[in-house]
Amino acid sequence: IYSRRWCSEYESTADLVEQACRNALTAAKISPDDIDLLIVATDTPEYISPSTASVVQYRLGLHHAATFDVNTACAGFVAAMDIAVKFIKADEHYNNVLVVGAYAMSKYLQEKDKKTITLFADGAGAAILQSKSELTKGYRQSKMLTKGEYHDWMGIYGGASKFPVNELTLQNKSHQLHFIKKIPPALNTQIWSEMIKEICEREQIQVTDVQHFFFTQININSIYDTMDALGVDRYRAATIMHEYGYTGSACIPMALDQWMKSNRIGEGEYLIFMGSGGGLAFGASLFKM
């Protein structure tokens, strides 16, 4: 990791989400009044309650938009996209859904923990999913998965109903990020490759037909091992952690934004989004440009 970015003392998750949304609206040339739903995927919310999405809806003037937050840890953006697709497919009144992945983990780090302080960073990325009549493009397949037996292996455990804020919680630093046990290194590679194969099989395509892969950016070796296991060239996978650090729910839309701006993605090409995070939560989706 050559560089990473943290919120200032006066910045918070809603600030990151707001700017990402403004960028997405400008790029898509869509008015705030045309957004029907705002979904914010984050495990570092503005508050426990109300939702971060409600704060941003007011700031952006999304006068016609419903809002809610989603917390599936670092798999959040893929989960939020899947929810957005389902809303669009199920209800004709949802035509433009603004989806954001955001991360302000610097607020929860222990300064003396060198394993986390050097890795985690802050950021946000947004995309707009739109209802279209053309059925051969856009969303194709998705799959969600949870391995709940790992729920107590890593996370932020203080400050909610199980361990409310009190003297003991603060003394134990339970309100900050903790890695209780080490996640098996091969687990991501195994589950990522299995889920990707499954959604490609559903679509009746080969994994090698997919031109672009956007993974959770937690470990470049996990990405490379997965690409090797799939028999796909490594260069098809976006890697941005060296430039931005690990940005949780934000890393996949940030990587997508970088590839879109560099004109790497062509019409008719397949994209896979593969997210994973604490819980353990996993989400995979297949789109066609």
Where on the chain are the PLM-derived regions?
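Condensing-enzyme catalytic core mediating Claisen C-C bond formation in acyl metabolism
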Residues: 1-10, 113-186, 194, 289
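Acidic-glycine-rich active-site phosphate/pyrophosphate-binding loop
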Residues: 47-61, 99-105, 165-169, 222-233
